[in-house]
Design a protein with these regions (language model features):
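Hydrophobic anchor at the start of a short beta-strand
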Residues: 3, 64, 84
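Cationic, amphipathic, low-complexity segments that mediate targeting or membrane/lipid association
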Residues: 170-205
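Glycine/serine-rich phosphate-binding loop and adjoining beta1-alpha1 elements at the start
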Residues: 1-37, 148
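Active-site capping/gating segments
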Residues: 9-15, 26, 143-171
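Glycine-rich adenosine-cofactor-binding loop
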Residues: 37-57
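Conserved Rossmann-like nucleotide-cofactor binding loop
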Residues: 49, 72, 129
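Rossmann-like adenosine-cofactor binding region
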Residues: 78-153
Length: 205
C-alpha cells in the first residue's frame, strides 16, 4: 500500500503561505498604534511564508529585514532586495524592529533577545508548536506577543479571501496526488519489466 500525504505537496504549502502572510499583516495592523508604512519589520525565517510575507510588508512601505540561519537563504533574500542577517545578529536587529514576524519553530526569540526589545515592539509568532518565542519570559517582561497558531483558518474566519485553499483546490490537489502515485507505480512496473527482459525504452521513463 502506498500512502501519500497530499498536504505536503509543494503547491498546497505555497498556497497556504499567501493567506498566512495576509493574516499576519492583518494582526500587525490591528495590534499596532501606528501605520505600518514607515515602520520597521524583521522577518525571522525565510521559507515559503517568509518569502510570501516580506515583499508584502515592503509593498506597504515597511523597512523589511530578514534573519535566516543558512547563508544561501540570506543570499536569496539579498538577491531579492532585502537586507539579511544571520541568527547571531538577531538580538541587535530585533531591538531596532517595530514588528517582528517569526516563522521558525525553534526558540530563537529567547529571554535575552526579548530583553533588548523596546516596550512598543510587537512580536507575531507564526511558528507551529512549540513556537519560536520564550512566551513565559515575554509575559514576565511585558513583551507584546501574538502567537498566531490559527492561521490560515483564522484568516478564513475573518473573511479574507482564500481561494487558493478552497475545496476546489484541495480536490485538484488530491487528483494530482493520485495521478502521481499511479505514474510512480507505472514507472516501477516498467523498470521491473525492463530488468527482466533487458530491454529499456526511453519512452517508459
Amino acid at each position: 500500500m502506498t500512502v501519500t500525504d497530499y498536504l505536503r505537496r509543494e503547491e498546497l504549502c505555497l498556497a497556504h503561505a499567501v493567506p498566512t502572510a495576509e493574516g499576519a499583516i492583518r494582526i500587525a495592523i490591528e495590534e499596532t498604534a501606528r501605520t505600518l508604512h514607515g515602520a520597521s519589520a524583521l522577518v525571522v525565517g525565510y521559507g515559503r511564508i517568509g518569502m510570501a510575507l516580506a515583499p508584502r510588508l515592503r509593498a506597504l512601505g515597511m523597512q523589511t529585514k530578514i534573519c535566516a540561519r543558512r547563508c544561501e537563504t540570506r543570499a536569496l533574500a539579498q538577491m531579492q532586495g532585502f537586507s539579511a542577517v544571520p541568527v547571531s545578529a538577531l538580538a541587535q536587529r530585533a531591538a531596532a524592529a517595530d514588528v517582528i514576524f517569526n516563522r521558525v519553530p525553534v526558540l530563537l526569540l529567547s529571554e535575552t533577545v526579548l530583553k533588548a526589545l523596546p516596550p512598543e515592539t510587537l512580536v507575531i509568532d507564526l511558528a507551529s508548536r512549540p513556537g519560536g518565542t520564550d512566551f513565559d519570559a515575554a509575559k514576565r517582561l511585558g513583551t507584546r506577543v501574538v502567537w498566531a497558531l490559527a492561521l490560515p483558518p483564522e484568516v478564513r474566519r475573518c473573511h479574507i479571501p482564500e481561494k487558493a485553499v478552497s475545496a476546489e483546490f484541495h480536490r485538484k490537489n488530491v487528483e494530482k496526488s493520485v495521478e502521481s502515485v499511479l505514474n510512480s507505480e507505472k514507472r516501477l512496473r516498467n523498470c521491473e519489466k525492463a530488468t527482466k527482459t533487458g530491454i529499456i525504452s526511453s519512452k517508459e521513463f
